[in-house]
């Protein structure tokens, strides 16, 4: 199992729209593609409170490539993204990392 850590930095004043898009659309679209989120977090204390951090679980890099590519091509995703950004972009930056658990990690 590998994990992908993704951090979305929302534009100022746009975090609620980003959270709504994930809650109302993104997660259910992921379900149809077999994408497995393990958790979602917002920053309470840190350098920015405009961040949504989440983690996805993958069996392999090949699975990640296949399922993420299918998600990005999904018309339902394009519609949800376009509607959520009707009055302007909501994301300033996205970063991601592919993580491999250590032998002593609770998540393997």
Residue map of PLM features:
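A short, polar/proline- and glycine-enriched secondary-structure boundary/capping micro-motif
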Residues: 17, 77-78
């Amino acid at each position: 199992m590998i994990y992908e850590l993704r951090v979305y930095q929302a534009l100022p004043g746009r975090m609620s729209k980003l959270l709504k898009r994930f809650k109302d659309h993104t997660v259910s679209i992921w379900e149809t593609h077999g994408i497995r989120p393990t958790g979602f977090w917002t920053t309470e204390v840190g350098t920015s409170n405009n961040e949504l951090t989440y983690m996805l679980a993958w069996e392999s890099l090949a699975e990640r490539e296949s399922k993420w590519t299918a998600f990005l091509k999904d018309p339902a995703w394009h519609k949800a993204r376009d509607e959520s950004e009707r009055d302007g972009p909501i994301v300033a930056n996205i970063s991601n990392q592919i993580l491999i658990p250590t032998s002593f990690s609770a998540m393997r």
